[in-house]
């Protein structure tokens, strides 16, 4: 069984303009999680099991991202500083924003690539000294969503379709 997780949509009209990433995998756990997710989409019934590999909104994505930010804070040390890298179209969610500020104040380095709206103000002494925000503007619309956590050397990478907006994290079904 093969599964594909992508960072955007499959709309043929925008495919020539958007740059996205995709993961083609034969990992049985990812495949099983995606079957459960599609069963939810087609039946409307809430899944009874927990996803083992994927993060899904509105079920667990936001809570898991907040937990990963908190974990980065707790694992960060002078010998092994924490690092969070996020690339999304927008960062509007107030809870994620607050968590990133907390991480910055705990000396976690945060690198954000945000194409559009961003609630974070980098470089504010005592609040966001450790946050760098850039926006990439070019010929192709940067459309990918990537979440990276150093996790004390046990690095984690996630890709998906959800931006860090309340509507994506709390209202829409997204992976």
Which functions belong to the PLM regions below?
Residues 14, 20-21, 38:
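Charge-patterned, long linear interaction tracts outside catalytic cores
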Residues 34-60:
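Long, non-coiled-coil amphipathic alpha-helical linker/lever segments
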Residues 1, 6-9, 13-15, 24, ...:
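PLD/PLD-like phosphodiesterase catalytic module centered on the HKD motif
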């Amino acid at each position: 069984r093969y599964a594909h997780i992508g960072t955007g949509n499959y709309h043929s009209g925008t495919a020539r303009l958007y740059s996205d990433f995709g993961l083609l995998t034969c990992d049985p756990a990812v495949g099983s999680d995606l079957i459960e997710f599609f069963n939810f989409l087609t039946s409307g019934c809430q899944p009874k099991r927990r996803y083992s590999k994927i993060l899904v909104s509105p079920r667990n994505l936001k809570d898991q991202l907040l937990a990963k930010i908190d974990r980065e804070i707790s694992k960060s040390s002078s010998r092994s500083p924490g690092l969070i890298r996020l690339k999304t179209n927008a960062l509007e969610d107030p809870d994620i924003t607050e968590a990133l500020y907390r991480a910055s104040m705990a000396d976690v380095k945060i690198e954000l690539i945000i194409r559009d709206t961003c609630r974070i103000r980098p470089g504010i002494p005592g609040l966001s000294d450790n946050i760098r925000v850039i926006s990439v503007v070019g010929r192709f619309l940067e459309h990918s969503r990537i979440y990276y956590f150093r996790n004390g050397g046990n690095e984690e990478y996630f890709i998906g379709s959800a931006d860090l907006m309340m509507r994506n994290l709390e209202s829409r079904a997204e992976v």
